Amino acid sequence: MSSEAETQQPPAAPPAAPALSAADTKPGTTGSGAGSGGPGGLTSAAPAGGDKKVIATKVLGTVKWFNVRNGYGFINRNDTKEDVFVHQTAIKKNNPRKYLRSVGDGETVEFDVVEGEKGAEAANVTGPGGVPVQGSKYAADRNHYRRYPRRRGPPRNYQQNYQNSESGEKNEGSESAPEGQAQQRRPYRRRRFPPYYMRRPYGRRPQYSNPPVQGEVMEGADNQGAGEQGRPVRQNMYRGYRPRFRRGPPRQRQPREDGNEEDKENQGDETQGQQPPQRRYRRNFNYRRRRPENPKPQDGKETKAADPPAENSSAPEAEQGGAE
């Protein structure tokens, strides 16, 4: 066993020799420091405190590059144009808004040059005049500086995108804004809900946006009673069956007005282009406001007011049916 121990000891000596040679190559090293042995040399490098020899103080330099993830880089001294190693622990005054210690590429810094394991190292790194360094643009900011702007930003963007893409009118966009706020947290449900929400405005808006179309429906339904007037409006709100109701009333008027002349037809067309749109809009407005209270008496008033234009408007349609 003693012979084996003796054979193991000589290999242990050569690793110490390279460490000594590496230490001898450093400028400013002494033989007494190297003679402390391999383990002593490693332990002496760990403290990284006042044991390191200071070469220069308050030296200005430009950051050559700095890796934020690994936490080290190199600074090029302005006086000697020498690259000096810098570690993140050597940064004395960091940017208060940065989460990690770092220096930006191309930034001018002020530092002290000390003797390190493999050459010159930077210590007490600050900005020019002792101000905090700017830091790398790749270093993350602190939470309290980035939390609120990033949380408040997305709701506004989602509202604008939701209004521009899915709402055709400005009023509809204002109504869908609170809905977009509720939907931003669940993006996978955005495709399901907007069609349901968009049915409401399209069911209500056509009464405002397209009064003449419903005016024709109302004129056709004036002679039929209040019960038939309510049905077309309700079906238009939910399902677009407007063409069927346009065709229905003129067929019922054909036998009544076969004796009208062509001159009256032209006059009726001109009067329809001038006066009825206003009347139709007013009728729809009154009907919409007063419908839940007492629909039947208003229907009687509307039939009296609507009889003359109804005859004129149905005349060309009646003769077209006779010609067929």
Swiss-Prot record:
Residue list for modification Phosphotyrosine: 162
Region span, Disordered: 1-49, 120-324
Primary location class: cytoplasm
Modification N-acetylserine, positions: 2
Compositionally biased residues, Low complexity: 155-166, 194-208
Region described as C5-methylcytosine binding: spans on this chain: 65-70
GO molecular function, one term: RNA binding
Any one of the GO BP annotations: regulation of DNA-templated transcription
Covalent link Glycyl lysine isopeptide (Lys-Gly) (interchain with G-Cter in SUMO2), residues: 26
Outcome of swapping residue 304 to A: Abrogates unconventional secretion
Record Gene3D superfamilies: Nucleic acid-binding proteins (2.40.50.140)
Keywords: Acetylation, Activator, Cytoplasm, DNA-binding, Isopeptide bond, Mitogen, mRNA processing, mRNA splicing, Nucleus, Phosphoprotein, Repressor, RNA-binding, Secreted, Transcription, Transcription regulation, Ubl conjugation
Biased segments, Gly residues type: 30-41
CC terms in the record's Gene Ontology section: CRD-mediated mRNA stability complex; cytoplasm; cytoplasmic stress granule; cytosol; endoplasmic reticulum; extracellular exosome; extracellular region; histone pre-mRNA 3'end processing complex
Annotated site, Cleavage, chain positions: 219-220
Subunit description: Homodimer in the presence of ATP. Component of the coding region determinant (CRD)-mediated complex, composed of DHX9, HNRNPU, IGF2BP1, SYNCRIP and YBX1. Identified in a IGF2BP1-dependent mRNP granule complex containing untranslated mRNAs. Component of the U11/U12 snRNPs that are part of the U12-type spliceosome. Identified in a histone pre-mRNA complex, at least composed of ERI1, LSM11, SLBP, SNRPB, SYNCRIP and YBX1. Interacts with IGF2BP1 and RBBP6. Component of cytoplasmic messenger ribonucleoprotein particles (mRNPs).
Domain-related comment: In the CSD domain, Trp-65 specifically recognizes C5-methylcytosine (m5C) modification through its indole ring.
Protein name: Y-box-binding protein 1
Organism from which the protein derives: Homo sapiens (Human)
Gene name tied to this protein: YBX1
